[in-house]
């Protein structure tokens, strides 16, 4: 039990630090190990979601003035609808093939954006927002990792890193809240999840403080390449685990 508490605490520090520094990645970081210490995969995604939601809430309170709702609401509503549907079929999913496809996709996307990001200009049109929200909803519902599609949209559409961080965290806060309700309805919000949250919340606060300091010293261009690199590493991690 003591080892599990320590693991949850350290995982929460690392995941919160990544989220605060890059604007995403809490689920990607913590879900590499969390399923191995939780009773079920559904409970692991639920705990990851509420810890990530807490991280996002802290950031939204700090960055609220940078939110532009007209660029946020279409992708957010699409994400909520798709992710809830994905959660309802979670118990019937076969993860082996999906993990391989997810890993390959993340690697290809990260390489493409790293080399061609200067040529890519994402327009905030409804089709683009719906597409990003759909992909994000599928990844969030199945894997608890809704970040990459939404992040690639926001990092290209937002004028600076402050707007980027405000938009991503508001998106993740609302999305994780709705997914948590859906997971609770499906029986994934258990006593074990509640206890895990108590153990992890201190780590979330510490990781957020450290990440906030690092974020202030990052340039916008460097932040983009860190994001692309982390997406690629996440994809490689999926392939190796599979």
Residue ranges of model-derived segments:
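Small-residue-rich hydrophobic segments that form or flank transmembrane alpha-helices
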Residues: 4-73, 133, 137, 147-201
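Hydrophobic alpha-helical transmembrane segments in multi-pass integral membrane proteins
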Residues: 44, 85, 89-90, 95, ...
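Selective transmembrane alpha-helices of multi-pass membrane proteins
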Residues: 79-87, 95-115, 199-212, 220-242
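Alpha-helical multi-pass membrane helix bundles of inner-membrane/thylakoid proteins
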Residues: 113-136
